[in-house]
Amino acid sequence: LLCLQKYSPGRETSQTCLAGENICFKKWKKGEKTSRXGCAVTCPKXK
């Protein structure tokens, strides 16, 4: 099953990941054009 998680580090970003896997999202700094990548907690199983 796939789970959808929304992250809003200034912008609403949604990424899909397999249950039990780690998903990565990009963090945008204000005034900077660089993006930092981070790993979120594993996707919740079920549902």
Swiss-Prot record:
Tissue expression: Expressed by the venom gland.
Residue ranges the record marks as coiled coil: none
CC terms in the record's Gene Ontology section: extracellular region
Key word Disulfide bond present: yes
Predominant location category: secreted
Disulphide bridges, residue numbers: 3-24, 17-39
Molecular function as annotated in GO: toxin activity
Subcellular localization: Secreted
Keywords of the record: Disulfide bond, Secreted, Toxin
Family from the record: Belongs to the three-finger toxin family. Short-chain subfamily. Orphan group III sub-subfamily.
Name this protein carries in UniProt: Short neurotoxin D2A
